[in-house]
Amino acid sequence: MAPKTNLQISVICASNQNRSMEAHNVLKNAGYQVDSFGTGSAVRLPGPSIDKPNIYQFGYPYDEIYKELEAQDSRLYTANGLLKMLDRNRRIKRAPCRWQDQDSIYNIVITCEERCYDAICEDLYRRGETLNRPVYLINVDIKDNHEEASVGGKAILDLVNKLTEAQDKLEELFPSIMADFQSNHPKLPVLYTIHFF
């Protein structure tokens, strides 16, 4: 049964590949309407060596990235989990999207890394507060690997469930929800604030 909420939810990491897409998948499977984005200048994925990443533009389809990396070195990208991740991603949406290139309005924005949180803060300041609509901006710091993304995705679902339960009193209950979340997930440091669209 889908959660009863009117909250517009967005999850964000640097490249809209691992952490944000894991959270997107978990939230979507729980019945939430959710979007996901990256904040970087390009999509960066591990390559054959640390100094040779695979770089793509936002909007380039996950399916095409999958096919290119499979042709490049199927064994390497299967062993490091990249093909499995891209397969999941292409089942969720067409392509990675960049936060700064969209103009939708969200009630809850959850980032997975402090530099992404900072980028969203800067973007919201740049846009201005013309609509006077609050956005609850939260950073759940998740290491960028498959295992931590899985743990983080479940924790984000827990957080979104709590925020949804309190949606009618969110402004009042937001600080205590965040304090409870931090004590229940001590290995996932959080930052949070309220901005306005």
Swiss-Prot record:
Subunit structure: Component of the cleavage and polyadenylation factor (CPF) complex, which is composed of cft1, cft2, ysh1, pta1, swd2, pfs2, dis2, yth1, ssu72, and fip1.
Catalytic reaction(s) noted: O-phospho-L-seryl-[protein] + H2O = L-seryl-[protein] + phosphate; O-phospho-L-threonyl-[protein] + H2O = L-threonyl-[protein] + phosphate
Keywords for this protein: Cytoplasm, Hydrolase, mRNA processing, Nucleus, Protein phosphatase
Stored Gene3D superfamilies: 3.40.50.2300
Family named by the database record: Belongs to the SSU72 phosphatase family.
Primary residence: cytoplasm
Organism: Schizosaccharomyces pombe (strain 972 / ATCC 24843)
InterPro entries: RNA_pol_II_suA
Localization per record: Cytoplasm; Nucleus
EC number: 3.1.3.16
Entry GO MF terms: protein serine/threonine phosphatase activity; RNA polymerase II CTD heptapeptide repeat phosphatase activity; RNA polymerase II CTD heptapeptide repeat S5 phosphatase activity
Designated gene of the protein: ssu72
Full protein name: RNA polymerase II subunit A C-terminal domain phosphatase ssu72
Biological process terms in GO annotation: co-transcriptional mRNA 3'-end processing, cleavage and polyadenylation pathway; intracellular phosphate ion homeostasis; positive regulation of telomere maintenance via semi-conservative replication; regulation of pericentric heterochromatin formation; regulation of siRNA-independent facultative heterochromatin formation; signaling; termination of RNA polymerase II transcription
